[in-house]
């Protein structure tokens, strides 16, 4: 669109990337471009594409026109300069870390994040020489003390998983930038409709598009958004981006791609070599979800408020962990960063232990017991024995996950039916 700043979120989510109908067919909907490769006009055109002088399609592992619309749209919604869609959220996170840190280098990360990200940082990446320190990001002194000479990024989530704890993004951005580091934020649970981390100092945003962006539990996908705010050339700490890269005939990505150097590096090198490519069909389905993102999020938030009120008044509930509550330690940050509400994925502690948690979960009907979240359908799981089961008892305690912790993902069903289903679960607890 001529100027994305002139349009509201609800308009951008429908139009960015396909301002005019498809030129080949006049189709209004974004077509699924089911092709592996693309015809070049002539030899010079092919050379320009491979040399990054012309940013168009080269090969399906790197780009696809359906994928391109999706990337442009999410980048616009986040306020970034470029997007890169990949096969899953895990791929988006992995590529981002691999693009920032190499063998012998280090990442500082929030400890209360998705269990899969903890495993990646603590177990998988160390096999490739990348170490991590997980910290309590509410203790800013602890964050700063964890930064070493070889630290390459600070990694956090807008809403922690599973307890929806909230970091002070602006304070952490200040620390990261003071040490010449980019701030990376996983905004999967926040969504750009509720919070745009780049506006608060983040440099790179990642998403599991499988969640709220897709919204319907049908499609895996991930997105990396380059904020275009970090000066890779001035930093001098990321030579594979700012200096001649021997893996791509000596190109300097900061010169070839300008503000979009980070996203371009991942596409041209990491995606090229390891191939976690999103399919055109997956990109199409995620675009369908994107077009209703604001409408769905409003309903998720509305329903969540009513579920929290119900749980607070239930005698079988020991504690509700939600940042909207005045006694939550992150309540002030919630009001500051989420003025329109949020955190439809949260936990509560049932009175008792694992037995009572299982009884409650196993007697729900509308809530589906599965590992996904952020679906239009309401979901439930027991984190300690599933999504976070690879963590040690000490790590679970640090993350605020107990035997009686239950995670809810509140969907868009009628609220009366959601509450009635929760009643069935509690009635089964002896």
Region roles according to the model:
Residues 1-57:
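N-terminal glycine-rich, Lys/His-bearing helix-loop that initiates the first secondary-structure elements
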Residues 2, 10, 122, 149, ...:
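PLP-dependent enzyme catalytic core of the Aspartate aminotransferase-like
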Residues 2-4, 17, 21, 84-314:
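Conserved PLP-enzyme active-site core in the AAT-like
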Residues 18, 34-40, 228-229, 242, ...:
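Glycine-rich beta-alpha junction loops
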Residues 42-91, 116-123:
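Conserved N-terminal alpha-helix of the aminotransferase class I/II PLP-enzyme fold
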Residues 154, 222-224, 320, 346, ...:
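Well-ordered beta-strand positions enriched in small/hydrophobic/aromatic, beta-favoring residues
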Residues 274-277, 281-283, 288, 292, ...:
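Conserved small-domain helix->loop->beta segment predominantly found in fold-type I
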